[in-house]
UniProtKB/Swiss-Prot annotation:
Chief site of localization: secreted
Membrane topology, record value: Lipid-anchor; GPI-anchor
Lipidation (GPI-anchor amidated asparagine): N680
Name of this protein: Lysophospholipase 2
Classification via PANTHER family: CYTOSOLIC PHOSPHOLIPASE A2, LYSOPHOSPHOLIPASE 1-RELATED
Length: 706
């Protein structure tokens, strides 16, 4: 991989702003505001009977860019082919012959964000060396880019920073205010500079409290959203507190079709339930809409007006629509909101109780019944009439909409939005950086789960290529290199429709140990660069050193569906590629030892992650003891006894200081005395802030399970 300054990040381009243009922000901060409703009497909700008018119109602009970019990419990919006449047919005046591409980025915390960044960099012609040693131009040729959980941290960062590139992020990586500066965890961003950390968390608490004071329900996901935003939008005022999801449609690079359409995925949770499975309602967010194709909802709403009180899509009060509820950080955090799963896991329930107690201590009016999920209130689909008659109407009957991490249903790859017949894609690149095995490598289970979903109630009208069981994935080495699924359309005719060919690209080791724990919540510059470089190599078969023909094989995968539908002659080089990379239906179902038991949820691993993320104070001591010194009259000096009694944390578990790591520049810090005054004004003491930091360490470690 030849990312500029990949090993010498000290050579930087100064003064270049990566933030989105000024049109990307609305309102005055994180709290939503009230605005007049649209003047026309149209509903804010539509039946999910096809693509929205806005998406359809945007596609016309995007198609013009992808056609040119894809022609250039395929010309390079097939330059050594004996017969390239098919390209002339594909790029004739008939635009329907041009293949359409989607890219899906899996969840997996910072591992997925960084490893996925390397894979995306390999596909981006803005990356130095990507055209010579990678798949440069493939990203420019793609129509859709979906992200889930940690993968959405990647896609959201790129899209809402004015479609910045991984290359630009790398070029600025050693700067203290750079994007993805995660040398210190979001829990303690100042490291040894406690002043900096206190001020950061004062701001976060005040911003979330402002949303509550404005009359909107809040949950732990709001705190998570604001904390994450400092990693993703550091160049924007208050780290993008006023940045909205819908504002992207007003940014030129998106409005003109110069970038893919970003899609993020979250799972719905029925009111009064906690279990999420393949029958969960799958929600997608685009800059235009949010909603679900699933029969349990079958509706979409304009994302710009989320939070508005509606009945069957019509505002209850035409003079009072909500603006700013679709905060970009909140949507990104929604896709990574995994709190409810912790309350179900025996090994994490104690930490969850700690978090619940902490959050209610510092933020007033936190939802008591549903603080473990992302709350969208009022429910934008209240009383809508598009639910399939065979389904319960509980989602549309509820006053609020509850969403959780998009991977909780076992589909850790956001493939469903890309395989919809309405989007008519020919090939989907599935970038899997999950941690399913004992060694934190992907097992292919997310592919298996998406395949199985088409046979569930929620999978009505869905099609996905045949894939093997998880043991076969591992036993046949399908997770050791890219594998193509659905290579022959003639073998898929018994499905609902012919789905896209899926190019599965798993996380594999090349130059760096890319199988970092999902619980790892801080990466220094060297680690970040190593993860990105390894992702680049995983996506390119080691910069083509493992297979010099790999670029051509990717070209074959892209043109395959159109070649079949046109009944055109397949280049002979593609025949060999498909023999090398297509799964041929062979099964090997014997139990694989790599699946003996993933340790993600073990309490020891969580405690270890907390110790890395916070400064060295035992959690049990903090929970059980009174605070002292620098306190204010409004400070709560101890936690409730039921939390302490339920804790099974060892008093010997300490939270080690990581102050030796590089920290945010001290030039931004204020004196301790001025900070103490500010802390008193905000009713947050130094001692309580230490408690806050430690308990937020528990939050961070648990969130790391995505």
């Amino acid at each position: 991989m030849q990312l500029r300054n990949i090993l010498q990040a000290s050579s930087l381009i100064s003064g270049l702003s990566l933030a989105a243009d000024s049109s990307s922000t609305t309102g005055d901060g994180y709290a939503p505001s009230i605005i007049p409703c649209p003047s026309d009497d149209t509903s804010l909700v539509r039946n999910a009977s096809g693509l929205s008018t806005a998406e359809t119109d945007w596609l016309k602009k995007r198609d013009a860019y992808t056609k040119e970019a894809l022609h250039s990419f395929l010309s390079r990919a097939t330059s050594n082919f004996s017969d390239t006449s098919l390209l002339s047919t594909l790029f004739s005046s008939n635009s329907s012959n041009v293949p359409k591409i989607g890219i899906a980025c899996s969840g997996g915390g910072y591992r997925a964000m960084l490893g996925g960044a390397g894979m995306i960099a390999a596909m981006d012609n803005r990356t130095d060396g990507a055209n010579e040693h990678g798949l440069g131009g493939l990203l420019q040729s793609s129509t859709y880019l979906s992200g889930l959980s940690g993968g959405n941290w990647l896609t959201g960062t790129l899209a809402w920073n004015n479609w910045t590139s991984v290359q630009e992020i790398v070029d600025h990586m050693s700067e203290s205010d750079s994007i993805w500066n995660i040398t210190k965890s979001i829990v303690n961003p100042g490291g040894s500079n406690l002043t900096y950390t206190i001020e950061r968390w004062e701001s976060i608490v005040q911003e979330v409290q402002a949303k509550s004071d404005a009359g909107f329900n809040i949950s732990l996901s709001d705190l998570w959203a604001r904390a994450l935003s400092y990693n993703f939008f550091p160049s924007l005022p208050d780290a993008g507190s006023a940045l909205t999801w819908s504002s992207l449609r007003d940014v030129d690079v998106f409005k003109n079709g110069e970038m893919p359409l970003p899609i993020t995925v979250a799972d719905g949770r029925y009111p009064g339930t906690t279990v999420i499975n393949l029958n969960a309602t799958l929600f997608e967010f685009t800059p235009f809409e949010m909603g679900s194709w699933d029969p349990s909802l079958n509706a979409f709403t304009d994302v710009k007006y989320l939070g508005t009180n509606v009945t069957n899509g019509k505002p209850v009060n035409k003079d009072q629509c909500v603006s700013g509820y679709d905060n970009a950080g909140f949507v990104i955090a929604t896709s990574a909101s995994l709190f409810n799963e912790f309350s179900l896991e025996a090994s994490t329930s104690t930490y969850y109780k700690m978090i619940n107690s902490f959050a209610n201590k510092y933020v007033n009016n936190l939802s008591q019944d549903d603080d473990d999920i992302a709350i969208y209130a009022a429910n934008p689909f209240k009383d809508t009439e598009f639910v399939d008659r065979n389904y319960t109407s509980s989602i549309v009957d509820a006053d609020d909409l509850f969403l959780v991490d998009g991977g909780e249903d076992g589909q850790n790859l956001p493939l469903v939005p890309l395989i919809k017949k309405e989007r008519d894609l020919d090939v989907v690149f599935a970038l899997d950086i999950s941690d399913n095995t004992d060694e934190s490598w992907p097992s292919g289970v997310c592919m298996t789960n998406t395949y199985e979903r088409q046979y569930s109630k929620q999978g009505k009208g869905m099609a996905f290529p045949y894939v093997p069981d998880v043991n076969t994935f591992l036993n046949l080495g399908l997770t050791n290199k890219p594998t193509f699924f659905g290579c022959d359309a003639k073998n898929l005719t018994d499905l609902e429709y012919i789905p896209p060919l899926v190019v599965y690209i798993p996380n594999t080791k090349h130059s760096f140990n890319g199988n970092q724990s999902t619980l790892k919540m801080n990466y220094n510059v060297t680690e970040r660069l190593g993860m990105i470089r390894n992702g680049f190599e995983a996506a390119t078969m080691g910069n083509f050193t493992d297979d010099s023909n790999f670029l051509g094989c990717i070209g074959c995968a892209i043109i395959r569906r159109k070649q079949e539908s046109l009944n055109a002659t397949l280049p002979p080089e593609c025949t060999k590629c498909f023999a090398d990379y297509c799964w041929n239906g062979t099964l090997s179902t014997s139990a694989n030892p790599e699946l003996s038991g993933n340790s993600t949820y073990q309490s020891g691993a969580i405690a270890s992650a907390i110790s890395e993320a916070t400064d060295g104070i035992p959690i049990t001591a903090l929970l059980g003891s009174s605070t002292s010194g620098n306190t204010t009259s409004n400070s709560t000096t101890s936690t409730s006894s039921n939390v302490t009694s339920n804790s099974n944390s060892s008093s010997n578990t300490t939270l080690n200081s990581n102050s030796s790591s590089s920290s945010i520049s001290s030039s931004t810090a204020r004196s301790s005395s001025s900070t103490a005054n500010k802390a008193n004004a905000a009713a947050i003491s130094y001692a309580n802030t230490n408690t806050l930091m430690s308990l937020l360490g528990a939050i961070t470690a648990l969130f790391g399970l995505i």
